[in-house]
Design a protein with these regions (language model features):
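Feature captures the FAD/FMN-dependent oxidoreductase FAD-binding
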Residues: 1-8, 47, 54-55, 105-112
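Short glycine-/acidic-enriched loop or helix-start segments at secondary-structure transitions
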Residues: 12-14, 37, 57-59, 108-109
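A short linear-motif detector with a strong N-terminal bias
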Residues: 4-6, 25-28, 49-51, 75-77, ...
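FAD-binding core/adjacent interface of flavoenzyme oxidoreductases
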Residues: 1-45, 121-137
Length: 138
């Protein structure tokens, strides 16, 4: 899972993501460093939390580098990035964008094995019964 939550990177606790932080949960900056500086792909199966421009650009970049980006999830009912990035980074690559959704659980002991995503209501609270699990290593 790659956390792309705005221009200032925040900790998992500050983002309200429950559970532990096993290996495989990266901020956008760390994921970019792996790819750009170390020429290392951080994962094969990816879930991205946050639809800002960096999140969408990372979705495209990871896809171009050979990863499978399952989806980009945004807690707000609208994308937080530019419309052109929704088109050029997600739609052009067949990457789904789920608005009003957020990660409600992180799975894995030593390494991330998946996340649970839930739809949220107008108060940004998870809606019971909407949970869906996604297998991912990042």
């Amino acid at each position: 899972m790659i956390l792309t939550m705005g221009c200032r990177e925040r900790t998992r606790g500050a983002l309200g993501i429950p559970g532990e932080r096993p290996a495989g949960v990266f901020t956008a900056g760390v994921a970019q460093a792996y790819i750009n500086l170390y020429n290392v792909m951080p994962a094969k199966e990816v879930v991205i939390l946050g639809s800002g421009d960096i999140g969408m650009i990372m979705a495209r970049r990871l896809t171009l580098e050979g990863a499978h980006v399952q989806a980009v999830f945004e807690i707000q009912p609208y994308p937080s990035g530019l419309p052109r990035n929704v088109e050029q980074c997600l739609n052009d690559y067949g990457i789904p964008l789920y608005l009003s959704h957020t990660v409600t659980a992180v799975h894995g002991d030593n390494r991330l094995t998946g996340v649970t995503v839930s739809r949220v209501d107008e108060h940004l609270r998870p809606v019971p019964g909407t949970e869906k699990e996604y297998k991912c290593d990042t």
